[in-house]
Amino acid sequence: MKKNIFTALIISTTAFILVSCGGQDEIYKEWIKEGGYDYPAKAINMTSLQGYQKVTLMWEKPMDPAVKRAILYWDNYAKSRDVNYDDFADGKVTIVVDSLEDRSYTFDVVNFDADENKSLPAELTVSPYGDSWLISRSERTVVSAIMDGDDAKIEMTKATDEMVATRFRYKDATGAWVDFKTLLKPGTNEITLPGALKGKRFEYSSAFCPSYGRDTVWRPWTISNDGISYKINASRWNVTVTTNQVFSENTPDKIIDGKVASASRWHSSRSDGLKNIFPKILSIDTGASPGEEFAFTKFVFYEHPSIVSMRYIKNYVMFVGSSPYDPNADDYANTFGIPFLSGIMSTANPTSEVVASTGATGRYIAIVFPNSWSSDGYIDLWELEPYGYIPSQAD
């Protein structure tokens, strides 16, 4: 009896297994091909070049004549492009994929033969560069732009990472725009714009290319903050100075007469009771009408041309504004507003240039001397040359 039961169980189990296996065969039958699949040759030696919003993909054309075409997939197979190998006679396939974003893409190449058998995919991940990358590149800025005769001398900040060149365009003497052909290279920061129109703003744009990239990309044009400065004729300006700070005929109006001469300079008081009084303040009225005020970008101070010990200017503070400055103000630091320029001058040279990164606009100027290199408290200014432009006429 036990033997019959055992035999029956074996027969039932065997039948169940046979039925189950038969069901599994039906499930996987569509994925199984008698004799196995034929896989055409896979794409080999797949490489890339990264460009601006694009990549260039390259691989070897299959040597198997049965392989006639391929499909290039990217974006997780959401996008594709057909590749006909007959279009590439030299044995090298080159495909450019553009309109890409700043991110990584995985590209797959699948080959097909005449019977539509497909190869295993050849895969390559590439990261093009685009607008996000370009925005992160820093543009140069203008250090100074000043007329030198009929030309403009432009000084820029140094080149930044991945910068390959900077181009310029400007207005000439006729008011026409000039696209200057000479490029400013990364190793230099000065350029001359021939025949530039003084007082006008100019434009510049730099090109960038990463070390791994093949495309050079130009940033949009940047308009200079200031116009091209020039030496201003200040002969009609009015200059006053702190009361009693004049020696003999050396009056303050002579610092803007265009002459660098001993008989044409301002010298502060030499009187024992007055010479060490500070601050000594020059107050200047340019007389400019509203809307025609200058934006000042540079001043050149002339002191004694030959005797070092007679160059007295030490610290200076300059202000530019729309209201007159009191030359007798004791509390200038709290009443004159924000200083435009300040610093300390050396006695090494007879001239000292004071340059602003951005021009300051106003009718009135104050130059404050809070001290002197001289123990006697002297200030001896032979000439003051102002440079600037009129903002309302700069475009």
List where the protein language model places each region.
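C-terminal motif of bacterial Sec signal peptides marking the signal peptidase cleavage site
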Residues: 17-20
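Pro/Thr/Ser/Gly-rich low-complexity, intrinsically disordered linker/stalk tracts
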Residues: 22-65, 120-161, 217-237, 387-392
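Solvent-exposed loop/turn segments flanking beta-strands in beta-repeat/beta-sandwich domains
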Residues: 55-56, 61-79, 155-180, 310-315
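Recognizes extended acidic, P/S/T-rich segments that occur
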Residues: 69-103, 114, 169-199, 339-345
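Beta-strand-rich modules
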Residues: 95-124, 192-225
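Disordered, acidic Ser/Thr/Pro-rich linker "stalks" and the adjacent N-terminal cap
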Residues: 222-287, 308-310, 392-395
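Trp- and acidic/polar-enriched beta-sheet ligand-binding modules for extracellular glycan
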Residues: 277-278, 307-395
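A short beta-strand element within beta-rich, extracytoplasmic domains
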Residues: 293-307, 367
